């Protein structure tokens, strides 16, 4: 596997003595070079002594040396300055576009490293590397978790940047879409993002003092003010529900006024959702959040503490929704506040990324640092990923820790990308008991 040979070369996980080219000249690897993930040779600026002469240049690596021709390197001038061609199997001499014949060296992946790699790739255990966790240096774990935390925030920043582009450069709109997506709490995230992009925030701004008109726009754009969007068993009651009828009337007027086009209600998912998580309730909560514009981006950026951020996002619903989960379905009175765990998730997945992304955009180290401070101030999320890592002996205390582990699982573990993981590196070079 070429990727594994790359890894062994990069980290010099091979015997450093006794190396020779195919024509018997001694080789000393001083610096394996900088790993290149783009077009061109695999490693730039390597330093290699061949037969006592120091060479500085590029190194190319393959499973078989004949892969050089398979990839047409003999026709590519980028490979003219290759100082060493490394392969696990030497089955052909190679030449450059200039007609030179770079020296070749056979490099076998050490047996133990290959065995350990196969263990990581083939096991059904999660985490695959669980057996070495208790023995890892705390400093190494801390450094890797910190890097993963930054990586996750940068990934979320990329998503916000894409939304910013889709929203024609409006940070307020990008924030609204991000907040709405996270109001889906996973199962309806995509639907909420689709919906948020169809909500005309500037139009909502003109009606921010009228909660019914905000609800009409929000629920109408979600396609939830249509009888077919209501379960059949509730349709008869909904058809004569005064609040439902009034919202329909308001929406028809506002849709005509602003030229609105609603989304398809079939995109919303209800299966296995608790009633308090129904889209109607979440949208009603968002409507109240934007009532009198209490929770815009400017207010968010003013939050200096997690407590202030949670107070900003804490919301309620209108009296109608205190006794309904959907139109035509009356229930016992419940004020339907967001739970503490829901508010924590909104801070983690909305507030923190927005502070970081906006801070990056404005070059504000203060906002970026505040994002990390918020993650350190919140307790770790309680999900199956966190629980499994705790079971194997990893200390998971803050939201920063849990976000790092989510990044680790989704970006590395799920893709079996152990060669890019620092824990995977430790596993590969571990000594068997």
Regions found by a protein language model. Name each.
Residues 64-86:
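Mg2+/Mn2+-dependent nuclease catalytic core
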Residues 7-66, 79:
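N-terminal ordered "arm"
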Residues 80-82, 86-144:
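Compact, glycine/acidic-enriched structural inserts
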Residues 1-7:
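N-terminal "leader" segments that precede or initiate the main folded domain
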Residues 149-404, 417:
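Hydrophobic, aromatic-lined core segments that form the binding pocket/scaffold
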Residues 62-66, 89, 110, 426:
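An acidic- and aromatic-residue-enriched active-site/binding cleft used to recognize and process polar
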Residues 32-37, 45-50, 68-75, 90-96, ...:
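Catalytic micro-motifs at enzyme active sites that drive phosphoryl/nucleotidyl and oxygen chemistry
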Residues 391-433:
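Acidic, carboxylate-rich catalytic segments that either coordinate divalent cations
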């Amino acid at each position: 596997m070429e990727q594994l040979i790359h890894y062994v070369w990069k980290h010099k996980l091979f015997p450093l003595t006794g190396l020779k080219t195919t024509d018997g000249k001694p080789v000393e690897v001083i610096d394996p070079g900088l790993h290149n993930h783009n077009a061109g040779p695999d490693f730039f600026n390597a330093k290699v002594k061949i037969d006592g002469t120091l060479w500085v240049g590029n190194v190319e690596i393959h499973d078989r040396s004949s892969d050089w021709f398979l990839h047409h390197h003999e026709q590519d001038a980028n490979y003219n300055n290759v100082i060493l061609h490394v392969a696990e199997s030497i089955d052909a001499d190679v030449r450059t576009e200039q007609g030179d014949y770079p020296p070749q060296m056979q490099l076998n992946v050490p047996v133990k490293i290959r065995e350990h790699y196969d263990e990581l790739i083939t096991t059904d255990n999660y985490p695959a590397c669980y057996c070495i966790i208790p023995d890892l240096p705390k400093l190494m774990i801390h450094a890797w978790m910190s890097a993963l935390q930054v990586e996750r925030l940068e990934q979320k920043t990329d998503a916000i940047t894409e939304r910013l582009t889709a929203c024609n450069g409006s940070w307020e709109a990008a924030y609204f879409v991000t907040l709405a997506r996270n109001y889906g709490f996973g199962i309806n995230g995509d639907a909420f993002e689709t919906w948020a992009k169809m909500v005309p925030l500037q139009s909502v701004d003109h009606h921010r003092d009228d909660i019914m008109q905000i609800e009409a726009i929000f629920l109408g754009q979600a396609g939830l003010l249509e009888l077919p969007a209501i379960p059949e068993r509730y349709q008869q009651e909904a058809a004569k529900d005064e609040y439902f009828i009034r919202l329909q009337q308001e929406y028809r007027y506002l849709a005509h006024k602003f030229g609105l086009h609603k989304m398809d209600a079939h995109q919303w998912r209800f299966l296995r959702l608790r009633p308090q998580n129904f889209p109607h309730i979440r949208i009603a909560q968002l409507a109240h959040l934007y009532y009198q514009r209490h929770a815009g981006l400017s207010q968010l950026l003013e939050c200096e503490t997690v407590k202030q951020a949670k107070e900003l996002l804490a919301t309620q619903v209108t009296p109608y929704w205190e006794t309904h989960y959907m139109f035509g379905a009356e229930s016992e009175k419940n004020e339907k506040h967001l739970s503490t765990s829901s508010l924590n998730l909104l801070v983690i997945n909305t507030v923190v990324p927005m502070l970081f992304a906006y801070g990056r955009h404005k070059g504000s180290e203060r906002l970026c640092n505040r994002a990390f401070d918020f993650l350190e101030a919140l307790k770790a999320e309680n999900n199956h990923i966190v629980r499994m890592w705790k079971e194997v002996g990893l200390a998971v205390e803050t939201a920063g820790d849990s976000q790092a582990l989510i990044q680790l699982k989704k970006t590395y573990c799920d893709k079996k990308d152990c060669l890019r993981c620092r824990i995977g590196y430790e596993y590969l070079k571990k000594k068997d008991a």
